[in-house]
């Protein structure tokens, strides 16, 4: 489904603003970027097949791997608009998909791997049912 740019950016801003304060306060020197699709270089770096979809990408040095030196260039979290729109049938689903993608990429910033992120996703999902 096609959503307008303002609506998408509103949901993205909401998702970034909803990062819990104990994590948001530790997000330093991170740029959130909105692109239509992953670049050929990003797809190649991740060894993505042509039919694979990517909603977001964290590029940088995860917080636990840093040695205390100051970085001049920011880490980057890129959110990919077209794949998220294609996977969303309603505005509510788009909002949820953007929120989950932002949370997922922020988790990578904090050094979490996909296994741990999946475990936390299950906990978050179960908690939201309570």
Label every model-predicted segment.
Residues 105:
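Walker B catalytic acidic pair
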Residues 51-99, 109-130:
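Active-site scaffold of zinc-dependent metalloenzymes
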Residues 1-67, 72, 83-86, 91:
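A metal-dependent hydrolase signature that marks the N-terminal structural subdomain at the beginning
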Residues 102:
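Walker B beta-strand of ABC/ABC-like P-loop ATPase nucleotide-binding domains
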